[in-house]
C-alpha cells in the first residue's frame, strides 16, 4: 500500500476478485468520485443529511430570538417555524407603485395649485419668478 494515493490515480486493487473490501464495500458499484474518496481516506462519507440534523438540535434562529424568548415576549413554539407561506409578501409592490403613480397623475392634472396646496407630500412650495 505504498502506492501513490493521489485523487487522479484510478488503479483498483485487482487481488480481490469479488470487488468487496474487508468493510463490506462493493468497489464495483462506487462512482469514480466515491472510489477516489475511498482510496484516499479508507472509508466513504456519510450519506445522511447533515443540515437537517443540525437544524433539529437548534433551539433559536439567532440571538434576537433567544433574547425575546428570555424576555417572555414570544413562546417557544414561535421561535423556529419552517413555514414557507410566511415568506410571501403582504402586498404586491408593483400594484402599490401603480396606485401611487395613478394618484400622482390624477392630482397633477387640472387644478394643480388648488388640490396640492397645503399637502405634505406635494414637495416644496412653488418659487416666485422674481427670486
Swiss-Prot record:
Main location: cytoplasm
GO molecular function: protein phosphatase inhibitor activity; protein-containing complex binding
GO terms for biological process, alphabetical: cellular response to heat; negative regulation of nuclear-transcribed mRNA catabolic process, deadenylation-dependent decay; positive regulation of G1 to G0 transition; positive regulation of mitotic cell cycle phase transition
Keyword Cytoplasm: yes
Compositional bias per record (Low complexity), positions renumbered to this chain: 106-122
Modified residues (N-acetylserine): 2
InterPro entries: Endosulphine (IPR006760)
Keyword annotations of the record: Acetylation, Cytoplasm, Nucleus, Phosphoprotein
Protein location: Cytoplasm; Nucleus
Other remarks in the entry: Present with 1400 molecules/cell in log phase SD medium.
Family (UniProt): Belongs to the endosulfine family.
PANTHER family for this protein: ENDOSULFINE, ENDOSULFINE, ISOFORM A
Protein name: mRNA stability protein IGO2
Gene behind the chain: IGO2
Amino acid at each position: 500500500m505504498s502506492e501513490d494515493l493521489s485523487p487522479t490515480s484510478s488503479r483498483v486493487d485487482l487481488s480481490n476478485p469479488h470487488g468487496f473490501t474487508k468493510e463490506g464495500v462493493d468497489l464495483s458499484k462506487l462512482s469514480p468520485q466515491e472510489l477516489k474518496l475511498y482510496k484516499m481516506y479508507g472509508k466513504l462519507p456519510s450519506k445522511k443529511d447533515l443540515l437537517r440534523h443540525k437544524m433539529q438540535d437548534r433551539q433559536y434562529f439567532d440571538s434576537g430570538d433567544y433574547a425575546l424568548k428570555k424576555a417572555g415576549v414570544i413562546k417557544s413554539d414561535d421561535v423556529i417555524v419552517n413555514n414557507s407561506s410566511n415568506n410571501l409578501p403582504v402586498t404586491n409592490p408593483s400594484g402599490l407603485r401603480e396606485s401611487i403613480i395613478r394618484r400622482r397623475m390624477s392630482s397633477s392634472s387640472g387644478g394643480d395649485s388648488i388640490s396640492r396646496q397645503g399637502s405634505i407630500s406635494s414637495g416644496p412650495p412653488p418659487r416666485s419668478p422674481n427670486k
